[in-house]
């Protein structure tokens, strides 16, 4: 260690090197021209002796410091020379001096990043294999404008922040260093010294592609992937996929608790791919939505407290293992949507919080920068580099992993400055309102760029308020999302279904109110993970009554969901009526499928999926009023509703009975004077029902409900039926029930 008197004798540059606080170590270290000779200088705190070349000149120690220097002949010394140094144990080490290499990042890269519009920023910042003058190594770069000094530390330098200080690139706030001969697989972090206070922070790489398995937090140098994709046909078709008018049935799942291995551990992405895809295909879903697999430190956060925005979590394997997962889904006709969290981030010391000793990614004022309910921090969307970080993350997952969509979490918390805040605990925008103008601009940029760069990819908002035009184009004043979750419908229908059927006629409006706004947005109907946790009970547990009634209620609820306007989303376990709440620490309760009732619900969901996807009237106009018309929305006394779903050329009739009372001789008006037949009945025996229903139904010229013709039906209790005009049509595998 250099004493204070010696330090005082050094030049300011030398002092800053010795104290590990120099912003431009290249000004001191490396190769410098002196007259007709070159001066080589290095800083090696553990060295006893240093040579240039294995048999070259011994470098002189400067004033008792760990700075070594010597003069060499320029013509006889390699441009990128190798230094050999001996430590206190007598062991010799060697390395090519990193301070002989010029800056690698282009001014244009830095300009675009400063403007917040570098769509490939993940290829610039972070740690990347790189070659300079035929020498392979790793180029490190990070953004920390308020740092006095940043060093790359890792197992390659004993985690010593004095060994590899980086250079700052002007006013950009970006720091970089090329370290020769490093290999992928090594652990690293950034050691950051704050300019104002001199505090030192050890941080994971915000752009890291892979991380240690928690609880460890180091980033891992990764090589550029050589994964050979096999989904070219899928991607080509996706570009022209008319998703507005196509069926979308999403299976939401948590990769860590869908299934476990024999020892109770996590499945690898590759093993999960095979088991999950086979199951999802058999159940008839079109897409899988993964709860966040971005790297995160806390299992109990379910992935929603992200620290690695460019890395699949190491819990389930490597980045290439995740590529295999997506590839296998695509080769089997299954799309993949990722739950992505740009609304907030955790306070973990190794993460983004106060990254350079200041509120860099977040706001300094907690009234803007903190979610106190969640214990997390809020991004500063008005800062170009922060916006670019998030946009780069979204584009990274779509480009590198071929994902088919992003579900954007907690959008409402981004839109409102007063979200979950008391009066006086938030700061109005410049117009005095509660709208977060910077977040709105970010979301519009996100949707615009994603749709431009990746046609056919979906961006879906979890947005729980009445914010207008969430799914309308940005050029008309909308936010530009493809779809949004219909939280209002979900809430109303679950409240209704929780009522004892004897009381439901008092709450009939909760069945029908949703149609007043059903076509104001492009809605997804979600029964998500949020509805089966925190004491809310499982979907089955929400249903009233004894065992028969609970299962029948759930079957009619799912029938309504799959025939109601909007795309579909169902959380794992709900498809077979799991009895308990979801628990992220264990697998789903798969033994329940040994029960005929639970197996029947899975059969019902599978048949509803196939009916939905094979019946264009049920999906072609999910987002337009021409695809829906009421037959009768007013039969509150009997808790029955009926409606028509249409496309341009066909229609189906849906009748739902929400009481445990069979309705015989129940007449409804129908659109056309043709025969009808049941193509679906949730009371079918194979679903666990009593097999009460209708065979071919004759239309009568009896005016009813304002229609010229009508039919007389038998409505099974707590059940829904779907009728189609007599023609070849989809029929459940177990057959259509008949009158008894």
From Swiss-Prot:
<dbReference type="GO" id="GO:0004553">
    <property type="term" value="F:hydrolase activity, hydrolyzing O-glycosyl compounds"/>
</dbReference>
<dbReference type="Pfam" id="PF00128">
    <property type="entry name" value="Alpha-amylase"/>
</dbReference>
<keyword id="KW-0321">Glycogen metabolism</keyword>
<dbReference type="InterPro" id="IPR006048">
    <property type="entry name" value="A-amylase/branching_C"/>
</dbReference>
<dbReference type="InterPro" id="IPR004193">
    <property type="entry name" value="Glyco_hydro_13_N"/>
</dbReference>
<dbReference type="InterPro" id="IPR037439">
    <property type="entry name" value="Branching_enzy"/>
</dbReference>
<dbReference type="InterPro" id="IPR006407">
    <property type="entry name" value="GlgB"/>
</dbReference>
<dbReference type="InterPro" id="IPR006047">
    <property type="entry name" value="Glyco_hydro_13_cat_dom"/>
</dbReference>
<comment type="function">
    <text>Catalyzes the formation of the alpha-1,6-glucosidic linkages in glycogen by scission of a 1,4-alpha-linked oligosaccharide from growing alpha-1,4-glucan chains and the subsequent attachment of the oligosaccharide to the alpha-1,6 position.</text>
</comment>
<keyword id="KW-0328">Glycosyltransferase</keyword>
<comment type="subunit">
    <text>Monomer.</text>
</comment>
<dbReference type="InterPro" id="IPR054169">
    <property type="entry name" value="GlgB_N"/>
</dbReference>
<comment type="pathway">
    <text>Glycan biosynthesis; glycogen biosynthesis.</text>
</comment>
<protein>
    <recommendedName>
        <fullName>1,4-alpha-glucan branching enzyme GlgB</fullName>
        <ecNumber>2.4.1.18</ecNumber>
    </recommendedName>
</protein>
<dbReference type="InterPro" id="IPR014756">
    <property type="entry name" value="Ig_E-set"/>
</dbReference>
<dbReference type="InterPro" id="IPR017853">
    <property type="entry name" value="Glycoside_hydrolase_SF"/>
</dbReference>
<keyword id="KW-0808">Transferase</keyword>
<feature type="active site" description="Nucleophile">
    <location>
        <position position="409"/>
    </location>
</feature>
<feature type="active site" description="Proton donor">
    <location>
        <position position="462"/>
    </location>
</feature>
<dbReference type="Pfam" id="PF02922">
    <property type="entry name" value="CBM_48"/>
</dbReference>
<keyword id="KW-0320">Glycogen biosynthesis</keyword>
<dbReference type="InterPro" id="IPR013780">
    <property type="entry name" value="Glyco_hydro_b"/>
</dbReference>
<dbReference type="GO" id="GO:0043169">
    <property type="term" value="F:cation binding"/>
</dbReference>
<dbReference type="InterPro" id="IPR013783">
    <property type="entry name" value="Ig-like_fold"/>
</dbReference>
<dbReference type="GO" id="GO:0005978">
    <property type="term" value="P:glycogen biosynthetic process"/>
</dbReference>
<dbReference type="InterPro" id="IPR044143">
    <property type="entry name" value="GlgB_N_E_set_prok"/>
</dbReference>
<dbReference type="Pfam" id="PF02806">
    <property type="entry name" value="Alpha-amylase_C"/>
</dbReference>
<dbReference type="GO" id="GO:0005829">
    <property type="term" value="C:cytosol"/>
</dbReference>
<dbReference type="GO" id="GO:0003844">
    <property type="term" value="F:1,4-alpha-glucan branching enzyme activity"/>
</dbReference>
<comment type="similarity">
    <text>Belongs to the glycosyl hydrolase 13 family. GlgB subfamily.</text>
</comment>
<dbReference type="Pfam" id="PF22019">
    <property type="entry name" value="GlgB_N"/>
</dbReference>
<keyword id="KW-0119">Carbohydrate metabolism</keyword>
């Amino acid at each position: 260690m250099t004493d204070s008197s010696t330090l005082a004798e050094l030049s300011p540059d030398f002092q800053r090197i010795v104290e590990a606080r120099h912003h431009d170590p290249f000004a001191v270290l490396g190769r410098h021209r002196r007259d007709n000779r070159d001066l080589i200088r290095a800083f090696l705190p553990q060295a006893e002796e240093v040579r240039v070349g294995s048999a070259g000149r011994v470098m002189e120690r400067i004033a008792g410091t760990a700075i070594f220097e010597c003069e060499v002949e320029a013509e006889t010394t390699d441009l990128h020379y190798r230094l050999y140094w001996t430590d206190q144990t007598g062991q010799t080490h060697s390395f090519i001096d990193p301070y002989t290499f010029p800056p690698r990042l282009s001014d244009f890269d830095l300009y675009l990043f400063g403007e917040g519009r570098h769509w490939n920023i993940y290829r610039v910042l972070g740690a990347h294999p790189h070659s300079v003058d035929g020498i392979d190594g790793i180029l490190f770069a990070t953004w920390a404008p308020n740092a006095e000094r940043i060093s790359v530390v890792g197992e390659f330098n004993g985690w010593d922040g004095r060994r590899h200080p980086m250079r700052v690139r002007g006013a950009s706030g970006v720091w970089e260093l090329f370290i020769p001969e490093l290999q992928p697989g090594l652990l690293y972090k950034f050691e950051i010294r704050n300019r104002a206070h001199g505090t030192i922070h050890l941080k994971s790489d915000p752009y890291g592609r892979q991380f240690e398995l928690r609880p460890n937090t180091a980033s891992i140098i990764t090589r550029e992937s050589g994964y050979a994709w096999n989904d070219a046909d899928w991607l080509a078709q996706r570009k022209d996929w008319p998703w507005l008018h196509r069926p979308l049935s999403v299976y939401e799942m948590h990769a860590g608790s869908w299934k476990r291995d024999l020892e109770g551990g996590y499945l690898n992405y590759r093993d999960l791919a095979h088991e999950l895809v086979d199951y999802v295909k058999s159940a008839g879903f079109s897409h899988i939505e993964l709860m966040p697999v971005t790297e995160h430190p806390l299992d109990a956060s379910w992935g929603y407290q992200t620290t690695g925005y460019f890395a699949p979590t190491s819990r389930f394997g490597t980045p290439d293992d995740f590529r295999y997962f997506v590839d296998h889904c695509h080769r089997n006709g299954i799309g993949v949507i990722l739950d992505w969290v740009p609304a907030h981030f955790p306070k973990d010391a190794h993460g983004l919080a106060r990254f350079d000793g200041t509120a860099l990614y977040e706001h300094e004022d907690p009234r803007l920068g903190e979610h106190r309910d969640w214990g997390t921090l809020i991004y500063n969307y008005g800062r170009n580099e922060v916006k670019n970080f998030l946009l780069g993350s979204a584009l990274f997952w779509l480009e590198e992993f071929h994902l088919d969509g992003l579900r954007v979490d907690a959008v409402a918390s981004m839109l409102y400055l007063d979200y979950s805040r008391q009066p006086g605990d938030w700061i109005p925008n410049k117009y005095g309102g509660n709208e977060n103008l910077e977040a709105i601009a970010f979301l519009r940029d996100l949707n615009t760029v994603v749709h431009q760069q990746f046609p056919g990819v979906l961006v879906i908002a979890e947005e729980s308020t009445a914010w207008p035009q969430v799914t309308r184009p940005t050029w008309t004043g909308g936010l530009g999302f493809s779809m949004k979750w219909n939280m209002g419908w979900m809430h109303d229908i679950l409240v209704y279904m929780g009522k004892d059927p004897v009381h439901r006629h008092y709450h009939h409006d909760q069945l029908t109110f949703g149609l007043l706004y059903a076509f104001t947005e492009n809605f997804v109907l979600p029964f998500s993970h949020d509805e089966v946790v925190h004491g809310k009970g499982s979907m089955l547990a929400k249903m009233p009554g004894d065992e028969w009634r609970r299962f029948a209620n759930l079957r009619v609820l799912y029938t309504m969901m799959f025939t109601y306007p909007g795309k579909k989303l169902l959380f794992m376990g709900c498809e077979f009526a799991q009895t308990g709440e979801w628990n992220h620490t264990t697998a789903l309760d798969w033994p329940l499928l040994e029960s005929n009732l639970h197996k029947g619900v899975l059969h019902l969901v599978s048949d509803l999926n196939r009916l939905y996807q094979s019946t264009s009237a049920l999906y072609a106009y999910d987002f337009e009023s021409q695809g829906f018309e009421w037959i009768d929305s007013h039969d509150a006394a009997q808790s029955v509703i009926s409606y028509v779903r249409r496309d341009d050329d066909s229609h189906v009739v849906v009748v739902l009975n929400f009481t445990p009372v069979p309705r015989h001789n129940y007449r409804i008006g129908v659109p056309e004077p043709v025969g009808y037949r049941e193509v679906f009945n949730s009371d079918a025996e194979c679903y666990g029902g009593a097999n009460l229903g209708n065979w071919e139904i004759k239309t009568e010229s009896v005016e009813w409900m304002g229609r010229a013709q009508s039919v007389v039906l038998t409505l099974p209790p707590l059940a829904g039926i779907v009728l189609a005009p007599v023609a070849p049509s989809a029929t459940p595998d177990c057959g259509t029930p008949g009158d008894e």
